[in-house]
């Protein structure tokens, strides 16, 4: 599984979505947040763990 770093423009929250593709990650982010950024950055497992953001 790959890690995608998002921010939500409405709440200002940063969060991570685990998904195999960027397109799937965007769809998951839209399920949980009103206005997630549409171009997330891929991050490593280590980076995701160290950031400590909520993961979906």
What is each stretch, according to the model?
Residues 3-5, 19, 39:
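Residue-level detector of functional hotspots within protein domains
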Residues 31-56:
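Short, mixed-charge low-complexity intrinsically disordered segments
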Residues 12-23, 55:
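Short, low-complexity, intrinsically disordered N-terminal segments
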Residues 18-35:
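Short, flexible N-terminal segments of the mature chain
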Residues 1-13:
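Short aromatic-glycine-(Arg/Gly/Cys) micro-motifs in beta-strand/loop hairpins
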Residues 8, 18-19, 45:
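Surface-exposed beta-strand edges and flanking loops
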């Amino acid at each position: 599984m790959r890690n995608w770093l998002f921010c939500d423009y409405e709440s200002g929250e940063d969060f991570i979505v685990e998904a195999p593709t960027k397109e799937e990650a965007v769809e998951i982010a839209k399920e949980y947040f009103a206005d997630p950024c549409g171009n997330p950055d891929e991050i490593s497992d280590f980076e995701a763990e160290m950031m400590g953001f909520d993961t979906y």
